[in-house]
């Protein structure tokens, strides 16, 4: 889906549901 979750994942984790870390940003389908 939308590629940007509006979240970064410098710590390696994403807090936004449905998002995964593609360093250094969170992405989703």
Curated annotation (Swiss-Prot):
> Origin, by domain of life?
Eukaryota
Covalent cross-link site, Cyclopeptide (Gly-Asp): 1-29
Q: Which SUPFAM superfamilies match?
A: Cyclotides
Which PROSITE patterns does the entry link to? Answer: CYCLOTIDE (PS51052), CYCLOTIDE_MOEBIUS (PS60009)
In its UniProt record, which GO terms are filed under biological process? defense response
Keywords of the record, alphabetical order, are: Disulfide bond, Knottin, Plant defense
InterPro entries named in the record: Cyclotide, Cyclotide_moebius_CS, Cyclotide_sf
What PTMs does it carry? This is a cyclic peptide.
Q: Which cysteines are joined by disulfide bonds?
A: 5-19, 9-21, 14-26
Which ranges form a coiled coil? none
Report the sequence similarity comment from the record. Answer: Belongs to the cyclotide family. Moebius subfamily.
* Written domain comment of the UniProt record: The presence of a 'disulfide through disulfide knot' structurally defines this protein as a knottin.
Free-text function comment from the UniProt entry: Probably participates in a plant defense mechanism.
Q: This protein is called what?
A: Cyclotide psyleio A
The organism of origin for this protein: Psychotria brachyceras
């Amino acid at each position: 889906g939308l590629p940007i979750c509006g979240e970064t994942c410098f710590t390696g984790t994403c807090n936004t549901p449905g998002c995964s870390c593609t360093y250094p940003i969170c992405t989703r389908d």
